[in-house]
C-alpha cells in the first residue's frame, strides 16, 4: 500500500507536496517506540526521491556514539586549553640579578623569555607538578616561580604534601586592598575557618542572583561599585638561591591582604571608604607587577603598574570597621599626622606565629618621611597638577634584613589631580597611600622582639645595619665589680693572717724533738724536724750537698756519708761511686735500703721463707746471714714447749719472749702447772714442782700419789727448781 503511493507520488510530481505531508503525519517519529521509524528523508532531487523514501534510517550504534562522544570531549579539551592559555602565565625564569630579591619579593622584575632546551620544553621544578607525578629538572643558578593560580584548589589525604601558599585561597580586592583568604578545606588544624566565610567576611555585597566571582581571580569594586575581575597571577619562589635558606612567605594562621597602590585618586569615595584602618596594617615588602612602560594609563583599572602590599591579618577577618571601631584603634595606635607618617602596629598573634616558624621575622614600625606627603597634599589642595615620582622597588641583597635598601633611579610621570572632587585631607591621604613606601620611607626601622642596640629609630637612622644578625644586649649581664675587696675577702685575709701567726708561734714554742745531727742545736716543732738514716735533722739542715735543695719528703742518696738529691745523683756522675746490692750485686741507682751495715735494693730485701718484702718491717738474721721475718724465724728457731710441743714465741703485742726452764726442758708459762690440780707452779716453797714419773705435780698431789702406791720401797722425791728466762 505504501509502495504504491510512493510510486504514484513519483509519477505525479505535482501532488508530491501533499502526499509527502500525509506520509510524514502517518509516520511515528520518536525514540520511545520499540520498532518505530526514525524519520523520512526529504532531501533529494526529483529523480532519487523514491529511493530516499524507501531507505529507512536506523538508530546510531555503539561505534557512532563513541565517535560522537570522543569528538565532543576533544572539543571541550581544546576549549579548556585555550581558556587556560588565555589567562594563565606559565612558569617564568628571571635573570640572575633578581635571584636575591626573588626570595623577598614575589615578582621584582619583568619576566624574561623561558629558555628551552633541545627538546623544546623548559626544565623547571614545581612542587605541584611533583604531586601529579611529574619531575622537571630546574635550570642551574636561576630561581623558578610557579603560578599557583594555575592549579586551582585541590585537597588530598596527605595534608603535608599540599603547598601552603596563596594559590589555593580566594582573593578579592576591596577598596584598593587585595585580600587573600585562608584555605577553607582545613589546611591548618589549629586555625579552623568557618564554611560561610565568603565575600560577606570581606565586607562586599553581591546582587541577588548574580554570578559569584570566579575562583582564583580577584574580584574588585570599580568606580561604579560593580564587581570587576582582575587576572592577578600569584607566583611563588619554588627554588631557593644557593646558600640561602628557604623561608615561608606568610604565617599559616593569618590571612594575607595585598594593598593595591593607585597612581592617582580621582574619586572621593575611594578615600572616604578606606576599608581598613592604616594603623592596623603590618609592615611588609612591596610587590610590583609591571606590564609595560609604554602602556601607561591614568585610569585606576588599567594602571600599567599595580603595586600590592603584603599585609598579614588574622584568619577571622571582620567586616569593614565602623567609625567607633576606628576610633578605638586610634586610641591604642598613635598616628603622627593625617598626611604625614603612618604608624604600623604589630599584631601579637602575628608575632607569635612568626616566632613559632623556622626563621626570625623582624617586625617593625615604619616611620615615613612627612616631606613628600605634605608636598603632595599642598599640590592637591591648590589644584595644580602634582608631579609624582614613581620609584622602582629596591633590589635588596639576600643578607639585608635591618638596613637601607638601595633603590633604582626614579622615573617621573605627570598625573593630574583634582582638588575640587575631594577635600584636602582625603586627597593627601590618598596621595600618600599611592606613593611607594620606598620613596617616603628611605629608612625602614626593624625592631626585634628581643632587646638590641638598634631597637630605636635614631640608632637605625645613624647606623644602618646589613645582615640578619643578633646584636649584643644593651645592658651588661655581669655587674661590674666594686672597687676594693669585699667583706668576705677581708674576713678570709684576716683568718689567714691569724693562722700564719699561730703557726709561727707554735714553731717557736713547739714540741722538743732532740738535737740536730748536723748543727747540734735543738729541734722544736714538727715543721722543723726531719728524720733520715736514723738521725734527726732540721729541715733546713738536711739538704743536698751539691745543689742545696731541701730533701724533706724527697728521694735522696747517701754516697760515702754525703747526701745527694735524685737529679744530682743521676746526672752528675755520682752513680759511678754508687753501692752495690748485697743480694743481687747490681748498682743501686734509685732508692737504697741499708741494714746490718750493708746496702740493698728495697725489692731485694725479702724473707727467705715467705718472700715478703721487709722494707720497714722487723726482721731477723741467722748465723748464715739469711733474712727472716719474725714469725718465720720463731717458727723455725724458737724453743719448743715440753708440755704442748709448740714453739715459744713472743707474746702478742710485745717483742719479749718468756719461757720456763725446768729439768732441762722449756715450758710456756701457762704450760708449767700441776697436771692433777692445775695449780701454777713457781719457785715459791709451797708451789714448787714435785715431778713423779715424768709428770709435773705439786707437793700435795705428789704425796697422795705416793700413798696410793703402798710400796715399802717408795721414798719421797725432792722438789725441782724452775727458772724463768726472758728472751728479747
UniProtKB/Swiss-Prot annotation:
Family membership noted in the UniProt record: Belongs to the zyxin/ajuba family.
GO BP: any one term: mitotic cell cycle
Keyword DNA repair: no
Stretches with biased composition (Polar residues): 1-17, 304-317
Annotated Gly residues bias: 29-49
Keywords in alphabetical order: Cell junction, LIM domain, Metal-binding, Repeat, Zinc
Keyword Zinc found: yes
Biased composition (Low complexity): 290-303
Protein name (database record): LIM domain-containing protein jub
Stretches the record annotates as Disordered: 1-20, 28-49, 189-225, 287-317, 407-427
InterPro entries referenced in this protein's UniProt entry, alphabetically: Ajuba-like (IPR047172), Ajuba-like_LIM1 (IPR047245), Ajuba-like_LIM2 (IPR047247), Ajuba-like_LIM3 (IPR047248), Znf_LIM (IPR001781)
Localization in the cell: Cell junction, Adherens junction
Domain LIM zinc-binding: from-to ranges: 514-575, 579-639, 640-708
Alphabetical list of SUPFAM superfamilies matching this protein: Glucocorticoid receptor-like (DNA-binding domain) (SSF57716)
Assembly description: Interacts with sav and wts.
Lineage, top ranks: Eukaryota, Metazoa, Ecdysozoa, Arthropoda, Hexapoda
Amino acid at each position: 500500500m505504501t509502495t504504491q503511493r510512493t510510486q504514484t507520488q513519483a509519477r505525479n510530481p505535482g501532488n508530491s507536496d501533499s502526499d509527502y505531508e500525509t506520509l510524514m503525519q502517518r509516520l511515528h517519529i520518536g525514540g520511545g517506540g520499540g520498532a518505530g521509524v526514525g524519520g523520512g528523508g526529504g532531501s533529494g532531487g526529483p529523480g532519487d526521491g523514491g529511493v530516499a523514501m524507501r531507505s529507512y534510517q536506523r538508530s546510531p550504534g555503539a561505534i557512532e556514539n563513541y565517535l560522537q562522544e570522543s569528538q565532543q570531549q576533544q572539543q571541550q579539551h581544546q576549549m579548556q586549553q585555550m581558556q587556560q592559555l588565555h589567562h594563565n602565565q606559565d612558569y617564568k625564569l628571571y635573570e640572575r640579578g633578581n635571584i636575591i630579591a626573588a626570595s623577598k619579593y614575589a615578582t621584582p622584575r619583568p619576566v624574561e623569555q623561558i629558555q628551552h632546551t633541545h627538546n623544546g620544553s623548559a626544565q623547571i621544578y614545581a612542587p605541584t607538578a611533583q604531586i601529579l607525578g611529574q619531575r622537571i629538572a630546574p635550570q642551574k643558578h636561576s630561581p623558578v616561580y610557579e603560578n599557583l593560580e594555575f592549579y586551582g584548589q585541590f585537597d588530598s589525604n596527605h595534608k603535608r604534601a599540599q603547598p601552603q601558599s596563596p594559590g589555593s585561597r580566594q582573593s578579592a580586592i576591596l577598596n584598593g586592598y587585595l585580600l587573600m583568604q585562608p584555605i577553607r578545606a582545613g589546611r591548618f588544624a589549629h586555625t579552623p575557618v568557618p564554611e560561610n566565610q565568603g565575600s560577606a567576611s570581606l565586607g562586599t555585597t553581591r546582587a541577588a542572583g548574580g554570578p559569584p566571582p570566579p575562583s582564583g581571580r580577584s574580584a574588585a569594586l570599580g568606580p561604579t561599585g560593580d564587581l570587576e575581575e582582575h587576572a592577578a597571577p600569584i607566583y611563588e619562589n619554588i627554588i631557593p638561591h644557593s646558600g640561602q635558606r628557604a623561608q615561608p612567605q606568610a604565617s599559616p594562621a593569618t590571612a594575607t591582604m595585598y594593598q593595591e597602590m593607585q597612581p592617582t585618586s580621582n574619586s572621593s569615595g575611594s578615600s572616604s571608604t578606606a576599608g581598613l584602618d592604616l594603623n592596623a596594617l603590618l609592615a611588609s615588602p612591596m610587590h610590583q607587577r609591571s606590564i609595560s612602560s609604554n602602556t601607561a594609563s591614568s585610569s585606576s583599572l588599567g594602571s600599567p603598574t599595580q603595586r600590592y602590599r603584603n599585609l598579614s591579618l588574622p584568619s577571622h577577618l571582620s567586616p569593614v570597621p565602623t567609625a567607633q571601631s576606628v576610633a578605638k584603634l586610634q586610641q591604642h595606635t598613635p598616628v603622627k599626622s593625617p598626611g604625614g607618617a603612618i604608624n604600623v602596629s604589630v599584631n601579637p598573634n602575628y608575632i607569635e606565629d612568626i616566632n613559632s616558624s623556622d626563621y626570625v621575622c623582624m617586625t617593625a614600625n615604619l616611620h615615613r618621611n612627612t616631606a613628600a606627603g605634605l608636598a603632595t597634599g599642598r599640590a592637591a589642595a591648590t589644584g595644580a597638577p602634582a608631579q609624582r615620582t614613581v620609584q622602582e622597588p629596591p633590589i635588596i641583597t639576600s643578607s639585608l634584613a635591618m638596613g637601607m635598601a638601595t633603590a633604582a633611579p626614579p622615573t617621573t610621570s605627570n598625573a593630574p589631580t583634582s582638588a575640587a572632587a575631594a577635600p584636602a585631607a582625603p586627597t593627601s591621604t590618598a596621595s600618600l597611600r599611592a606613593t611607594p613606601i620606598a620613596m617616603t620611607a628611605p629608612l625602614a626601622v626593624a625592631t626585634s622582639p628581643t632587646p638590641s642596640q638598634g631597637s630605636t629609630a635614631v640608632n637605625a637612622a645613624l647606623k644602618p645595619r646589613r645582615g640578619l644578625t643578633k646584636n649584643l644586649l644593651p645592658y651588661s649581664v655581669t655587674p661590674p665589680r666594686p672597687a676594693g675587696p669585699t667583706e668576705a675577702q677581708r674576713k678570709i685575709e684576716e683568718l689567714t693572717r691569724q693562722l700564719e701567726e699561730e703557726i709561727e708561734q707554735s714553731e717557736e714554742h713547739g714540741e722538743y724533738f732532740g738535737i740536730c745531727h748536723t748543727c747540734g742545736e735543738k729541734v722544736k716543732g714538727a715543721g722543723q724536724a726531719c728524720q733520715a738514716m736514723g738521725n734527726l735533722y732540721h729541715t733546713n739542715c738536711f739538704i743536698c750537698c751539691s745543689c742545696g735543695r731541701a730533701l724533706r719528703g724527697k728521694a735522696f742518696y747517701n754516697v760515702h756519708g754525703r747526701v745527694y738529691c735524685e737529679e744530682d745523683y743521676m746526672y752528675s756522675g755520682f752513680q759511678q761511686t754508687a753501692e752495690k746490692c748485697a743480694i743481687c750485686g747490681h748498682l743501686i741507682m734509685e732508692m737504697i735500703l741499708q741494714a746490718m751495715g750493708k746496702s740493698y735494693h728495697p725489692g731485694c730485701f725479702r724473707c727467705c721463707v715467705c718472700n715478703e718484702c721487709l722494707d720497714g718491717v722487723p726482721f731477723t738474721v741467722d748465723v748464715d746471714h739469711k733474712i727472716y721475718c719474725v714469725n718465720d724465724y720463731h717458727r723455725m728457731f724458737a724453743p719448743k714447749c715440753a708440755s704442748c710441743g709448740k714453739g715459744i714465741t713472743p707474746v702478742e703485742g710485745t717483742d719479749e719472749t718468756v719461757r720456763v726452764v725446768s729439768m732441762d726442758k722449756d715450758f710456756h708459762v701457762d704450760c708449767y702447772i700441776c697436771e692433777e690440780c692445775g695449780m701454777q707452779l713457781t719457785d715459791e716453797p709451797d708451789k714448787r714442782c714435785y715431778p713423779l714419773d715424768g709428770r709435773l705435780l705439786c707437793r700435795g698431789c705428789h704425796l697422795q700419789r705416793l700413798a696410793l702406791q703402798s710400796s715399802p720401797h717408795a721414798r719421797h722425791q725432792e722438789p725441782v727448781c724452775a727458772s724463768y728466762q726472758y728472751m728479747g
